[in-house]
Amino acid sequence: MTAPTDEPRVQLPTDQDLVLKVIPMPGDCNANGDIFGGWVMAQVDLAGSVVPARYTQGRMATVAVNEFVFKQPVRVGDILSFFSTVSRIGRTSITVKVEVYAERFSRQGQYIKVTEASLTYVAIDDNGKPREIPKMDPAAAI
């Protein structure tokens, strides 16, 4: 990991949906004092489900975490912004890309990418079985 002063600053994406903003608290830390990776993963799963929910129009479940990369540590007080976009829509499943950016508490207005992931969700019926995703205009899902 790079030192805090060497963190690469980036611009927030303009071609993805902002689906979640959250500030991690001290209770979310691991033994090293950084935010626990499992907490970040849970937030990514929640954020990743927002766009697919617009398409599935009903129950869905996370079926796969295809890729998950921790690029920088997350710290207490960071303002995390979660952006998501659809990568693929299948008959019963939808894959999304999620990118997470941190605005460090001590450096307001400056962003670094801390996490990126790809997750797949499957539309399910009341019995938990896969069901077809209704056809819709992607513009209507925004």
State each model region's role.
Residues 57-73:
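Small beta-barrel nucleic-acid-binding modules, principally OB-folds
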Residues 3-4, 8, 14, 18-20, ...:
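HotDog/MaoC-like acyl-thioester-processing domains
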Residues 31-34, 53, 72-73, 109-111:
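Short histidine-centered beta-strand/loop micro-motifs
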Residues 38-58:
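Active-site helix/loop of acyl-thioester processing domains in fatty-acid/polyketide metabolism
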Residues 2-37, 54:
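Catalytic strand-loop segment that frames the active site of acyl-thioester-processing enzymes
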